[in-house]
């Protein structure tokens, strides 16, 4: 299992290049251009309350732009903000789950706040204990010619970069063809269930 993991240079990491991440301006970009990089940096260097507020507001705006778009394309349909927002809905949960544009801004803001609080807890954990490889939630990347396109673990990557780590440890690295094969196997597995 150890052979599958690599320590990759934080300077060679770019964000997942899915359609709606690209439309938002950070898909396929290096760490310093990710919106949440800025929020994490504000939190670590200055003020967690300000970072929390900016991050939540950004997530709410992104949600209303991309709430009907599939997560597989970088959208937010049935993603974390959506899921946490539903927890605050009193009536019509099922309808709001199927059509997130029915959610009001207050519930989406509460859902986004839950997610940001989890990210801030992650930040504190990395600061206090150092970065820990999580086998239950591995970070995966696709190796291109001279970069690594992260397919998950973006917040962890941003934190270690801000803290000065030169490498992000324990990343499962795929070639592009192997990643595409993996995606198809997952689709087939879902279909067979």
Descriptions of predicted regions:
Residues 6-9, 24, 53, 72, ...:
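Generic serine detector
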Residues 5, 15, 52, 82, ...:
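Histidine (H) residue identity feature
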Residues 44-103, 108:
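Extended, charge-rich helix/loop segments that form flexible
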Residues 87-151:
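Short alpha-helix boundary/capping and kink motifs at helix termini
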Residues 2-65, 134-187:
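A short, basic-hydrophobic beta/loop patch
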